[in-house]
């Protein structure tokens, strides 16, 4: 079980590890920083594959056997890590990240199921909670881990590759350990595929991919040629002309998925849970907090990349994110103690307000000449998020009957990840569109016929410093304002969750 938890931790670390190393990655791969709607897929590719893998691999483990399925997921994660480490184009990197994400996402539900199988019915709840906590710790420390590794290998060319190369020996050791354990374990039928909800997983994948393609590409929709980001040296997004069709495909796939899951004898998702109001509230809250978390994890390194020397980006990004991640972790640990003293409704409502205030402070206090002005907002926002996460993970387990607790825990995490991927796609699109609007009057950077290369590059650099960077930072500040609004929007759902927990406490600990 310890080896399985190590695998889950590694998979969740890679969820956010690119946050601090993304600027270096796109620079080494020759991607223009203006093409954010393209390179954001190094994040989205992992998240979408991770989400799809959770219900699919979880179901396969029921049919094929836990250990065998876990080893397959581990091998997929290993293959993705190697592909990321050797990628020489953005497309290859995105494919590698997607393969990684599918393997990493598959590790989580199998580990949760293993915890239930190993610990028995009495220890099931604690085991599921512990696996979920390990997964949360992983994506919290991911950006810091990425920066530490790139600093350790700073003398090497393209040190970010070592973040993925170091996965290989660790995974090989874990494979040997787990393979020995799997030999002594029973396995399921090799005809497992007959019992899989293939239409369900297909519709879920189509809905996620098309929705995110549309959202991430929406910033350029309707923009004139040579304006906005294109004036800053970015390239045309070929999908921008197909956004209505992509959105239509996403809506149709989602509707068909809901209809299919209602009628399926072996649904991909635990349909009965979705009828319960506390679970519905956790879906909304997890979607919102996922978006808020990812805005912070991605945009802080982007601010640093825009205003700092390239060699210092990873270190400074991790240094700034450290207070945020520490605050999230510390508040998560304190949440249970605080809930013993205070009403859960007021505690969670206060946490929402803290998350919103933190995002507001980042937007209002950000100073490109002094990055430390970000820290107060990061700490306050981290405390708010940390106080929310335990409740959002435990309520689905409390609602579900013992047979469905693993599926409930996986579903809660899946919707948080869905919030991350939709949030980063939608806010990226809004940011690009806003930047298009702000920079619409800028003349494109075009080399004159008789202009020397040195003169053109100098003019381009001046343009970037005087126009592109200030406008980009302004837009990023505005995304934090949107994040604050998203945080406040989940207040009704959070209040319902707090009310449910308070009611359960009253039943379990009746007044004297």
What are the residue ranges of the model-derived segments?
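Transmembrane-helix exit segments and adjacent C-terminal regions of multi-pass membrane proteins
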Residues: 1-6, 182-187, 240, 256, ...
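12-transmembrane solute porter fold
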Residues: 2-20, 43, 237-246, 253, ...
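Extracellular/periplasmic helix-loop-helix junction of adjacent transmembrane segments
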Residues: 21-52, 315-319
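Membrane-interface helix termini in secondary transporters
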Residues: 24, 55-59, 63, 148, ...
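Cytoplasmic loop-to-transmembrane helix junctions
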Residues: 38, 123-130, 316, 404-411, ...
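Central cavity-lining transmembrane alpha-helices of secondary-active solute carriers
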Residues: 43-58, 108-113, 322-335
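Helix-loop-helix hairpins in multi-pass membrane proteins, especially solute transporters
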Residues: 62-200
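Hydrophobic transmembrane-helix bundles of small-molecule transporters
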Residues: 152-284, 471
């Amino acid at each position: 079980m310890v080896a399985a938890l190590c695998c889950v931790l590694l998979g969740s670390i890679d969820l956010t590890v690119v946050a601090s190393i993304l600027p270096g990655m796109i620079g080494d791969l020759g991607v223009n920083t203006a093409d954010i709607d393209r390179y954001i897929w190094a994040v989205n590719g992992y998240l979408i594959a991770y989400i799809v893998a959770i219900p699919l691999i979880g179901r396969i483990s029921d049919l094929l056997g836990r250990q065998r399925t876990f080893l397959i997921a581990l091998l997929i994660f290993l293959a993705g890590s190697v592909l990321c480490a050797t990628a020489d184009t953005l497309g290859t990197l995105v494919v590698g990240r997607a393969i990684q994400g599918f393997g990493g996402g598959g590790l989580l539900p199998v580990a949760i199921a293993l915890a239930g199988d190993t610990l028995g019915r009495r220890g099931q709840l604690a085991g599921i909670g512990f696996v979920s906590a390990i997964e949360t710790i992983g994506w919290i420390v991911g950006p810091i881990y990425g920066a530490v590794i790139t600093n350790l290998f700073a003398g090497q060319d393209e040190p970010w590759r070592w973040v993925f190369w170091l996965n290989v020996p660790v995974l090989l050791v874990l494979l040997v350990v787990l393979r020995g354990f799997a030999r002594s374990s029973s396995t399921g039928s090799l005809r497992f595929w007959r019992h899989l909800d293939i239409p369900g997983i297909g519709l879920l994948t189509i809905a996620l991919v098309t929705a995110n393609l549309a959202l991430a590409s929406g910033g350029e929709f309707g923009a004139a040629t040579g304006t906005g980001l294109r004036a800053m040296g970015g390239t045309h997004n070929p999908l921008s002309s197909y956004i209505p069709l992509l959105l239509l495909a996403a809506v149709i796939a989602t509707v068909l998925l809901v209809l299919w899951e209602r009628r399926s004898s072996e649904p991909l998702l635990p349909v009965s849970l979705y009828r319960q109001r506390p679970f519905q509230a956790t879906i909304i809250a997890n979607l919102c907090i996922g978006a808020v978390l990812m805005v912070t994890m991605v945009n802080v390194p982007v601010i640093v990349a825009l205003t700092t020397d390239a060699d210092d980006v990873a270190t400074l990004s991790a240094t700034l994110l450290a207070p945020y991640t520490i605050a999230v972790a510390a508040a998560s640990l304190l949440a249970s103690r605080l809930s013993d003293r205070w009403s859960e409704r007021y505690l969670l409502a206060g946490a929402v307000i803290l998350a919103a205030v933190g995002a507001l402070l980042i937007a209002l206090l950000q100073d490109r000449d002094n990055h430390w002005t970000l820290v107060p907002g990061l700490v306050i926002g981290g405390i708010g998020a940390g106080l929310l996460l335990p409740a959002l993970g435990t309520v689905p387990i409390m609602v579900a009957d013992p047979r469905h607790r693993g599926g409930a825990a996986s579903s809660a995490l899946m919707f948080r990840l869905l919030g991350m991927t939709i949030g980063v796609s939608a806010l990226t699109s809004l940011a690009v569109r806003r930047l298009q609007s702000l920079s619409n009057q800028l003349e494109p950077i075009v080399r004159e016929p008789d202009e020397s290369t040195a003169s053109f590059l100098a003019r381009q650099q001046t343009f970037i410093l005087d126009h592109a960077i200030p406008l980009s930072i302004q837009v990023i500040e505005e995304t934090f304002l949107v994040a604050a609004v998203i945080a406040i929007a989940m207040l009704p759902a959070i209040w319902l969750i707090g009310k449910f927990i308070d009611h359960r406490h009253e039943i379990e600990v009746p007044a004297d």
